[in-house]
Amino acid sequence: VRIAFVHYPGRLARLEAARSGEGPTEFLFGAVQLERQGHAVSHHEVDPAAPAGRLARRLIDRQAGLRRLPPHTSAAVLAGTRRLLPGLREADVVVATTTGTAVALASWRWARRLETPLVGIVAGLLNDPWGRARRATTLPLLRRMHSMLYGPGEAPGLEALDPRLGGRVHVNRFGVDTAFWAPGGRPTGGVLAIGNDGHRDWATLVAAAPDIPAEITVLTRHEPPAALPANVRWQPADWHSRLLGDDEVRDAFRAAAVVVVPVKDVPQPSGQSVTLQASACGRPVVLTRTRGLWDPDVLRDGENVLLVPPGDPDALAAAVQRVLDEPAAADALGRAARATVEAAAHVDAYAARLLEICERARARP
């Protein structure tokens, strides 16, 4: 199958390392696995920060900001995907790996500029309320692609929007490369929190910090609050600009006594990749139990993860304290976390499911 992947920047720079085994493969969304199986895979990138004309920004970006256009609609991404159309027409199926690229390419399908079947990896479409204008502009696009979600939390809401979306909404739980993310060495102690998505609940972690008797390292591109507790180190880390390499992230996971993933209570999965990567490294994880929990039947509190209520600093601090106070139980939690990822969250299974969804898109564009 000829499969064209359309990404935001940062993926192509990691492609050769992923192919050679020197870097993790999950950041290519299963493409490396499909390539190894003999499928013809191509990669393309679109920069949402590219310059766009003043008129385009006013007509598109401003209207999207007012929630009159589909979520994540962008003049720059529409222009960037338009330039890719000739090459994408040669593929059997296109996989858009972000909500922004999915919305843009579905727009070109709606305009009949692209006939190639489209699979869009989307998240957060329902985070903000939909008015009549957003509904009128978004539903026609959703009917022109197959939407792939990372967890079941958003699926009922999407399917309820329009009966014609039946069979077009699919769940494919994220999987990670357990050959790269693997245990190594002994932890040196401390608490690690890492992540850049907009749903990280850093405020709750900072509020919990005074009750955590350990140094807390936060790695993120987000700005720190004005006042930090004495035991919190806030360091810049940006995946796209590679301020921190994948091997350095792995070393940080391995060194941590516990990895904390505080997230806000939203319906989309958040903190998924960090949780799975840290778990694959055999580290105990404290994770917020949200509406968007991607695999509630597999993530079992006290067995392979510690789950805490959203926005509860006391519960978060108590869970971290529990891990720090009980090293034997923490080791058992980490071993169970690694086994769970190997059994239920491997990138190979993610790639196989993606191929299945691509075939469904080809059968029903």
Residue ranges and their predicted role:
Residues 143-159, 164-181, 188, 196-199:
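Donor nucleotide-sugar binding/catalytic pocket of nucleotide-sugar-dependent glycosyltransferases
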Residues 82-90, 125-147:
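Membrane-proximal helix-turn-helix segments that form the acceptor-binding/catalytic region
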Residues 227-228, 289-302, 306-307:
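Short acidic/histidine- and often glycine-rich active-site loop of Leloir-type glycosyltransferases
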Residues 253-270, 283:
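Acidic donor-binding loop of glycosyltransferase active sites
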Residues 26, 187-249:
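Conserved catalytic-core segment of nucleotide-activated headgroup transferases in glycan assembly
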Residues 315, 322, 329-344, 350-353:
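A short, well-ordered alpha-helix in the C-terminal region of glycosyltransferases
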Residues 196, 299-313, 322-327:
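Conserved acidic donor-binding segment of nucleotide-sugar-dependent glycosyltransferases
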Residues 1-49, 89, 210-211:
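N-terminal subdomain of nucleotide-sugar transferases
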